Amino acid sequence: MPRGLELLIAQTILQGFDAQYGRFLEVTSGAQQRFEQADWHAVQQAMKSRIHLYDHHVGLVVEQLRCITDGKSTDADFLLRVKEHYTRLLPDYPRFEIAESFFNSVYCRLFDHRSLTPERLFIFSSQPERRFRTIPRPLAKDFFPDHGWEPLLMRILSDLPLRLPWQNKSRDIRYIIAHLTETLGEDALPRCHVQVANELFYRNKAAWLVGKLTTPDGTLPFLLPIHRTDEGELFVDTCLTTTAEASIVFGFARSYFMVYAPLPAALVEWLREILPGKTTAELYMAIGCQKHAKTESYREYLCYLAESDEKFIEAPGIRGMVMLVFTLPGFDRVFKIIKDKFAPQKEMSAAHVRACYQLVKEHDRVGRMADTQEFENFVLDKRQIDPALMALLRQEVPEKITDLGEHIVIRHLYIERRMVPLNIWLEQVEGQQLRDAIEEYGNAIRQLAAANIFPGDMLFKNFGVTRHGRVVFYDYDEICYMTEVNFRDIPPARYPEDELASEPWYSVSPGDVFPEEFRHWLCADPRIGPLFEEMHADLFRADYWRALQTRIKEGHVEDVYAYRRRQRFSVRYGAISSTANSS
């Protein structure tokens, strides 16, 4: 193979990444127009399209390499030299960290996820000392209350690129000042100032102004979700100023933001101050760089593993019928493998389960479905596997593992945020915490349904509780679109004996769901039943579900808020007209 071809291959890969990220920015830049035109279906389509861009461009590069090298690109030693040339191209490259992940993806596609070693891949960055380049233009702008907070906020809102009129800008400014005064105190407010990101963060039906509020006691988030009325007028729905609130807004159960970020590493570093609890992987995930987030997540896992003497164990909770789930006791993630054989009542294939997980990846998760990262040929050191888990792996997933002596290779798995299973949480809490959990569970079901998602299996064990007390769905093997379900009322019994029979007295077809039956397994606990009947009795009525289906089929897209209804300005301070119903 002629010398110089390695450099050509390296340049081809980098050019392929340039093309991918250019398209990524192109799709992202359309977010403002989609918001202004209230084209919510285009918002959903753009989200799916942007996710697919990465794999599409990896495939294009792989085909180019096979043509250029006449198939010899599968020679590992040759690609080692390609990596050396690629590394030399990165010091002057502005998105070097994601370009490294793109190289990894091309390599994995060529080698079918085999021979994944540090010398062949960018397992860790080639430039760890360089998180981001000198920024050619500021990411954010500072605003000081030299003449008071009212003119300061007027400048901020007036500087926004949105081309729609405001419903009542002065009113929104009064509400923001009222919130800041309540939060910080009237004396402290004049000594504070704000730094606001130049780009808006778009997601669902909102445009988020993201900023930092510098106070005498430190820096706080400053988040303003901007919505539009049905008449096309802008309004600020609330103001969020705590790290806990910001963490939920940027949470792992939400869709990725559309934010124009030609230098994503710089934006990640800027966000870190107001999201101190978020890892680098989570921040990249939040801004839509999900493939690089996977790289960062794997690095975080390796760093944890290197400093821990823990053993992998089966995850706490009721053992699943489809997935084998394990974890490290102190690690905040779980590892999920599709079993070789499912329980008899699970009439589905492994391909169906993978399709369900992909559906969740591409769909609006509305803060109620955990994001996952998919890995192939995942290597574990046997010495770090608890014997009980090792036995379980050999029993449940022998076709998914390869024994290499000191290591095993898991052919395919998902990594997901670890949560407390809701059924365990409900056993441990009482009083207001119990009430909050049941309210959260019902709200999760409602918000999923409004987003055209039916969980299928609604048992408490299939949901988890986050560190912020939010209830999130994480078992996807029976998930489907709401519009695919036939919600039915149970027909009246023909005879008294019918209700005692082991078989139903009515016909049941595939896709039939009888919401009345939910009551039997959601309200069996006497502590939970009355709370559920009080807050969520409508979930047991087929007409409730059919009404939601009608709204979905008519094209209605519900508002989903990343904060409590009571935090909305319309609830706290007064009505705002022409808004959709709160979730």
UniProtKB/Swiss-Prot annotation:
The keyword Endoplasmic reticulum does not apply. GO terms for biological process: glucose metabolic process; glyoxylate cycle; tricarboxylic acid cycle. It is found in: Cytoplasm. It catalyses: L-seryl-[isocitrate dehydrogenase] + ATP = O-phospho-L-seryl-[isocitrate dehydrogenase] + ADP + H(+). ATP binds at A315, P316, G317, I318, R319, G320, M321, K336. Its EC number is 2.7.11.5, 3.1.3.-. Keywords: ATP-binding, Cytoplasm, Glyoxylate bypass, Hydrolase, Kinase, Nucleotide-binding, Protein phosphatase, Serine/threonine-protein kinase, Transferase, Tricarboxylic acid cycle. The keyword Lyase does not apply. It comes from the Bacteria. The active site is at D371. GO terms for molecular function: [isocitrate dehydrogenase (NADP+)] kinase activity; AMP binding; ATP binding; phosphoprotein phosphatase activity; protein serine/threonine kinase activity. GO terms for cellular component: cytoplasm. NCBIfam families: PRK02946.1. HAMAP family: AceK. Belongs to the AceK family. Bifunctional enzyme which can phosphorylate or dephosphorylate isocitrate dehydrogenase (IDH) on a specific serine residue. This is a regulatory mechanism which enables bacteria to bypass the Krebs cycle via the glyoxylate shunt in response to the source of carbon. When bacteria are grown on glucose, IDH is fully active and unphosphorylated, but when grown on acetate or ethanol, the activity of IDH declines drastically concomitant with its phosphorylation. This is Isocitrate dehydrogenase kinase/phosphatase. It comes from Salmonella enteritidis PT4 (strain P125109).
